[in-house]
Amino acid sequence: MANIAVICDREFFQPFDQRVYKEVLTLKRAGHEVEIITPHNSNLIKEIEGISVHCVTTKGPPVSTAYRLIKKAIAKDYDVYYCHELDPLLYSFILKWMKNKPIIWDCHEYLVPMKKELQGNLSAMFTDIGIKIAAPRVDHIITVDNLLGRQLAKLNKVTVVPNYPTVNDFPVLEKTLESKKPNFLYVGG
């Protein structure tokens, strides 16, 4: 089976990234060796359910965190690089050039509109350019919904994998409460 590096663009532990965790457990159950590489407040290796989590410090200028993530990713001979979100997508240029291994990009956000709303037009424009240049160069894209999947399919091959909470995320009530009030359901990761 494959030896997979999952590269995160934000802290995996605080807050705990349930989406990445579910994906990693699924890959592990399928027989793959999986390790997570993530920004963190210090350099260390943690283990969670037999999965190594390589933490690299975020101290220093932002570019130094990217450098450390890439350095950690190329230090081992992984079979596949699984990049979460925008920054690791951009790192994939270097990973592909240095290691020539398959790159999977997991995009679960509408990045351009989000950047526009949170950081303005210039950030949205650079994000759009970065995606249009980098996404066609990865080996595959995974996303969470059909609309985003159709948008990204213009750039590369896409697989849509919906991200719903597991049944274990909800407590089981011993008895059912009867109520005339409506029930609301939340579907999300």
Label for each model-derived stretch:
Residues 147, 164:
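Carbohydrate-associated surface elements
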Residues 84-90:
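Short, solvent-exposed amphipathic helices
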Residues 34-41:
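A short beta-strand-loop structural module common to alpha/beta enzyme folds
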